């Protein structure tokens, strides 16, 4: 059997789409909301089976990965998150790059020699890597309108991944991938797919509500926002953090969204002018992790909000 384990955001979706356009296969899809990255524990694979893992951290899957490799399962991995210690095993192949201007879809694009570049461009835009997206798009000779369409596609696919549970999402990420699968041409998906229209409309509604929320604390070096326990807030949290980062490139941003379970889910974006420190900040808190430019905390107790805010402004002090 073959399994595709992928992050449910734009980067995971577009990475998988590129791979399966290049290497068609019938596989079992294993995915979830964007923050559900401990996916290998959900896979019951046997000797000779194959797993393709995309845009999920090795570190968060270390124990099940070791067990699967010892059982004789072959695992290929593409990712841009901090991997921790990588296993050395003949059944394991990894392409990992944690540079701040790289996403998993760009790594897959590199692996495939640009065979399906437009999807990688969309994913890079979705990950708020605008400069990297434009560099990748340069050989495609796209118009400004086409480049804008890929940006909107990436942002909408990314938006669908955010939520406390699958019930918050417009589409289960596996179903959204199945909607992408018939389309080698990203522009055809944009023009024809009803799923894209649903995401575009939902994105506009949810972002309008998010932009109406005032900052809880704002300084020249950073801003903290607290969003309510509402499905729209959970869907908008990550994409609104990206939006704020783009609008204020010298400022860091943190969005704390109340979960139905009572804790807060945190999204952090380093300043675009200095894409570093987000992962180190979040890793100081249990359930925290991510990338240098963009990271998060899955469970922040309300009592620890003052500790987090203090650590945030210490990580991003005023000049």
For each feature predicted by the language model, list its residue ranges.
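Generic intrinsically disordered, low-complexity segments enriched for polar/acidic and small residues
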Residues: 3, 75, 156-159, 174, ...
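Short N-terminal helix-initiation segments at or just after the protein's N-terminus
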Residues: 58, 161-173, 191-205, 235-242
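Short, solvent-exposed coil/turn linker segments
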Residues: 44, 103, 172-175, 179-189, ...
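Loop-centered beta-sheet repeat module
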Residues: 133, 137-184
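Oxyanion-binding "anion nests"
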Residues: 98-99, 179-226
């Amino acid at each position: 059997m073959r399994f595709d384990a992928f992050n449910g955001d734009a980067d995971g979706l577009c990475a998988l789409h590129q791979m399966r356009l290049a290497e068609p296969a019938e596989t079992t899809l294993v995915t979830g909301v964007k923050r559900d990255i401990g996916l290998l524990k959900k896979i019951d694979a046997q000797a000779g089976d194959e797993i393709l893992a995309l845009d999920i951290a090795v570190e968060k899957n270390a124990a099940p990965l070791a067990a699967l490799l010892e059982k004789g399962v072959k695992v290929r991995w593409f990712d841009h998150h901090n991997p921790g210690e990588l296993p050395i095993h003949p059944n394991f192949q990894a392409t990992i790059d944690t540079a701040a201007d790289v996403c998993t879809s760009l790594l897959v694009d590199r692996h495939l020699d640009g065979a399906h570049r437009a999807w990688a461009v969309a994913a890079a835009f979705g990950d708020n890597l605008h400069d990297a997206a434009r560099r990748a798009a340069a050989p495609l000779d796209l118009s400004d309108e086409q480049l804008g369409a890929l940006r909107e596609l990436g942002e909408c696919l990314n938006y669908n991944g955010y939520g406390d549970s699958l019930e918050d999402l417009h589409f289960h990420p596996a179903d959204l991938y199945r909607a992408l699968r018939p389309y080698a041409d990203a522009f055809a998906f944009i023009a024809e797919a009803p799923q894209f229209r649903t995401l575009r409309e939902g994105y506009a509604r949810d972002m309008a509500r998010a932009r109406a929320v005032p900052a809880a604390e704002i300084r020249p070096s950073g801003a903290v926002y607290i969003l309510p326990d509402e499905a729209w807030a959970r869907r908008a949290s990550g994409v609104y953090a990206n939006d704020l980062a783009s609008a204020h490139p010298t400022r860091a941003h943190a969005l704390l969204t109340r979960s139905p379970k009572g804790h807060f889910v945190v999204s952090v974006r380093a300043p675009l002018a200095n894409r570093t420190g987000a992962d180190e900040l979040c890793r100081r808190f249990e359930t925290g992790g991510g990338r240098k430019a963009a990271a998060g905390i899955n469970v922040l107790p309300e009592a620890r909000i003052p500790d987090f805010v203090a650590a945030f402004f210490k990580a991003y002090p005023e000049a």
